[in-house]
Amino acid sequence: MADRLSARAAIAALTTEFEECVGFEERAGFEERAGAGVPGRDGAGNGPLGWSGYADSRARAAARTGEEESVVHGLASVGGRSCVLIAFEFGYLGGSLGQRTGDRLEAAYEAARSRGLPLVSLVATGGSRMQEGMVALTQLQRVARASARLRAAGSAHLAVLRDPTTGGGWATLGAGADVILALPGAQVGFAGSRVRPADADPRAYTAEGQLAAGQIDAVVPPDELPRTVARWLAALHASGSPAPGPAPVPDALGATGLPRTGWDAVEQARSPSRPRAEAYLDAYFAHRLPLRGDRCGGTDPGLLCGFGRREGRTIAYVAQCGTATRPAGYRTAARVIRLADRLGVPVLTLIDTPGAANGAEAERAGAGAAIADAFAALAEAEVPVTTLVIGEGGSGGALALAAPGNTYVTPDSYFSVIAPEAAAAILKRAPDAVRATADELRLRPQDLVELGIARAVVRPAPPADGDREPVG
C-alpha cells in the first residue's frame, strides 16, 4: 500500500504556490438548488436523505482532518506553470463524493475552463458517499458534464492517482483525464477492496497493473512528480495560436545513397543496423513525455507515442518501431492524435512497420476497427501532421499513420502496397521473381517522390549549419 498523504500534504509535495478557493462554490451550489425549488437538498445537516448520524460523522471528519469537505481546490503554479489544482482528502469520509464535493469539483472545472488553464487532480477516493445515496451518485454526471465543457474549451486535464483511487472517482476524474499518472503501489480500480470478487487478481487493481493494461500513462515516484507534472503542464498548455506550424521534418540518420533497385530498398529498410524510431526521437526532442495504452486494456511496445518539446514548442509524436503494429497501437495513436488536435499541437509520425499485426489474436482484438480509427483520426485532424518514413512502409498498416500530402521518406526506406514476397506469392510467381516484383511495385524512395506519394527524400543533416538537401 502506498503512503496516504492528506490533501494539504499532497499539494505541498507538488508545489508551494497554491491559493485555495474557499466557500464560494458551496454558496453557489446551494443558491442554484434553491432556485430550482429544492432548498432542502443542500447536503447540510444529515444530508439530502436525512441519514441518521451523518452530521456527526462529518463533524468528526472535519475535526480529524481540518477540512470541511473531501476536496480542496484552488489556483496553483507547478514549476512556473499555472493550473487549477484539485486534491482529495481521503481522511474525510474516505474521500467520498457528496453533493458539496460536486459543488467544489464543478467550480474547479469551471475555473480551469474560464481561465484557459490545465486542470490537475490529485485523486484519492473510495467513490460516491453512501449517506447521500443517489444524490451522491449523480455527482458523477456533474463531473462528466464539467469535463466535457473543459475539453470543448481546449484545456487539458492531468490526473495523479493516489492511494486509493476507486469507484466513481476513478471512472470520472481518473480515467476521464487526458494524461493519467499514478503513484507507485496505489490501489486503482473501479471496484474497491470490499466489493470486488474474492478470487480477483489483486495485481489488476494496482497502478502497476493498470499501466500494464494500457489504462494509465505512467507510474511516477513521488520525488519525480513535481518535475513530471511541470513538464506535462508545459506540453499540454495550448499556445493559443489558431494555426500552429507543422512539425519540422527530422533529419535522416542512416544511409545517404539512394537504392539502385527495389530489392535494394527493401534490404536497406530491413537492415538491423538501420536507425530506429528511438534514435530519431532522441535526436529530435529535448525531452519526451510518453503516453501509453489504448484505454481498452491493451498496449503495443512496438509503438512510441507522446508529447515532446523541441526548441520551445510542443509536438506530439507517434512512432512505429519496426514491428507489426497491434490493434492497441492504432487505438493509442488515434488517442494521441485526437488529443493533440484538441489542444492545437502539431503531430509528427514516424513510419516503420512490415504491416499491421494480422494473426488471430489481432483479429479478435479488433484490428480492422483499430486501423479504421487511426485513418479517421488523421483525416479529422485540423492541426498539421508531418510524416517521415524511416524504414519499412508496409501497406495499410503503415499508411494509417501517414499524413496525406505531407509525407517524406529517408534513403533507407520503402513504401509498398504489399511486401514483394507476398505480392509474388499472390501472383503465383516463382520465389526467384521476388526481386523483379519489388522493382515493379516502384517502392523505392525516389519512386515514391515521382509518384507524388512523398514530397521529398530527406538527407542526413550537413556537418555545418544549413538546410537539409531534399531530392526529387
How should each PLM-predicted stretch be described?
Residues 102-106, 137, 327-330, 334, ...:
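Non-membrane alpha-helical structural segments and their capping/turn regions in soluble enzymes
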Residues 93-100, 132-135, 323-328, 360-368:
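Flexible beta-alpha connector loops of hexameric P-loop NTPases
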